[in-house]
Amino acid sequence: MFNNCDSRTNGEYAFFMNIRDKIDCIFDVGCRSDSEFVNFAGEVHYFDPVSQFIEELKKNKNVNRSAHFNNFGLGEENKQTYYFPMYQSFYDRTNSCRISDDANKILLDIKTGKDYIINNDIKNIDFLKIDTEGYELNVIKGFEDYIKNIKIIQFEYGGTFLDNKTKLIDVINYLEQKGFHRFSYLTSNGTEIITDFSDHYQYCNIVCVNKTCILSPY
């Protein structure tokens, strides 16, 4: 369950395979160049602030009915902020990794999920996957009340939360207030409901479901 970054064996791929025929629109935030969703037959919106990742992803074989490649990150506000290439993160991971990448930092673009939804007239998002190396809560907050139009959310948790100074319960409480429940770890054997939200900083993926969602992903 913890500290397995291989999506094929840590439960991520199995979870997606379980829901893919029940969903139509995906937001892949922090897609890099190796998104699993290029093989999804529906609509996918890809987001990554690193232009190299987006350009490489565009070259991959893609069966999406509609693919939207966005060379910016998502966050709480529209701005430029420093990105640390060694960590592929908007946080310099000096707390969890003890080594600074400040000498290599670059300014990259961030926009809000709310503005993207409004500007592109998006009515519903079935699956929001967030892999942003510590920027998860920033991404989530950027949707504001439009997050209620999302059915399923998956986000990473781990050592990056030492760097962003966020507690897991902060994310849980925010999403609960927005109508999400059934917070669960993805594991190689399926999902496991979380009963203890104390911080352990072990790498894992967490999923939750909007209470208004009629499909049962797990």
Q: Locations of the language-model features?
A:
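Phosphate/nucleotide-binding beta-alpha loop and adjacent structural elements of enzyme active sites
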Residues: M1-Y218
